[in-house]
């Protein structure tokens, strides 16, 4: 048998990649009009980012069930679970408590990121598991990926950020932001302000510059995410392809309903695993 990798629906891994590398996921939740909607399971309105909804992490019951199934299917080889940043969701803490109940064969990794910042770490673990590596090695592969990953998001609207409460230090600048558009990064698991500029196109340009500076002439795995703006995401992917010839083209995916609620319509983000091979 082989080690089984589990993640959550913040990861934005396309279904074909999850299937290829046998990566399982548990749902995060959206609470809307008295309903508890499971990301990736229940039907969620396309315009959820416009609704007054809230988000919640994977439940202990869901995590325990997923880990126990994975542990059984691994034949005792173990489980590596890679989850959304502990600073952004209660999922990781619930996962830690669940793993402690199940014993040392379940290892939980804090991605300290979101979207494909989670996905790239899960992919690293999935590849190691597919190669037949033992539990410690698979866990180290995920942890090594965490140390290589950077994530940015250019935000077009401020309403969702004001409601979110997930942005470190946001109260200090949101009230005086006027029409300035923020570029955020994930720093040690927290969403923090990098820079404020006059237009979202300028914020996006700065984001592209930052990514290119990080990568240089090295290979890297790239992902571009968006909230209700695939054209903008495709433009970012094209710009990265032109400026980073050593990298395979970026995958482009929606940011997903949970993250969309926090950053709002028109947001475009980039996740990069510097030095990694592309997720093919």
Swiss-Prot record:
The record lists hexadecanoate as bound by 89
Question: Which keywords accompany this UniProt record?
Answer: Lipid-binding
Q: Name one Pfam family in it.
A: DegV
Q: Where is the DegV domain?
A: 3-274
Superkingdom is Bacteria
Asked whether the keyword Nucleotide-binding is assigned, the reply is no
Mention one GO molecular function: lipid binding
Instruction: Check the record and name the InterPro entries matching this protein.
Output: DegV, DegV_C, DegV_domain_contain
Which PROSITE patterns does the record match to this protein? DEGV
Q: Which GO terms describe its cellular component?
A: plasma membrane
What this chain does, per the entry, is described as: May bind long-chain fatty acids, such as palmitate, and may play a role in lipid transport or fatty acid metabolism.
Please give the NCBIfam families that the UniProt record associates with this protein.
Answer: DegV
Q: What is this protein called in UniProt?
A: DegV domain-containing protein Rv2417c
Q: Which organism is it from?
A: Mycobacterium tuberculosis (strain ATCC 25618 / H37Rv)
């Amino acid at each position: 048998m082989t080690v089984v990798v589990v993640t959550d629906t913040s990861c934005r891994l396309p279904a074909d990649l999850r299937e290829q590398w046998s990566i399982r996921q548990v749902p995060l939740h959206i609470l809307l009009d008295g309903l508890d909607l499971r990301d990736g399971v229940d039907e969620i309105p396309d315009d959820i980012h416009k609704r007054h909804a809230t988000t919640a992490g994977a439940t202990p019951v869901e995590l325990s069930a997923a880990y126990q199934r994975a542990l059984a299917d691994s034949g005792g080889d173990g489980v590596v679970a890679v989850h959304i940043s502990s600073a952004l969701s209660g999922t990781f803490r619930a996962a830690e408590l669940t793993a402690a109940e199940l014993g040392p064969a379940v290892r939980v990794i804090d991605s300290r990121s979101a979207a494909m910042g989670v996905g790239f770490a899960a992919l690293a673990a999935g590849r190691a598991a597919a190669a037949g590596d033992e539990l410690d090695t698979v866990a180290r592969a995920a942890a090594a990926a965490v140390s290589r990953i950077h994530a940015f998001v250019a935000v077009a609207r401020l309403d969702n950020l004001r409601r979110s409460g997930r942005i470190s230090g946001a109260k200090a600048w949101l009230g005086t932001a006027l029409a300035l558009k923020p570029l955020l990064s994930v720093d040690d698991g927290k969403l923090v302000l990098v820079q404020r500029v006059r237009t979202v196109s300028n914020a996006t340009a700065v984001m592209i510059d930052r990514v290119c500076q990080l990568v240089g002439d090295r290979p890297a795995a790239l992902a571009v995410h968006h909230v209700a703006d695939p054209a903008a995401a495709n433009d970012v992917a094209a710009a990265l392809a032109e400026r980073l010839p050593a990298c395979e083209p970026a995958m482009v995916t929606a940011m997903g309903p949970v993250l969309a609620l926090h950053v709002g319509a028109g947001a475009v983000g980039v996740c990069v695993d510097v030095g990694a091979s592309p997720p093919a």
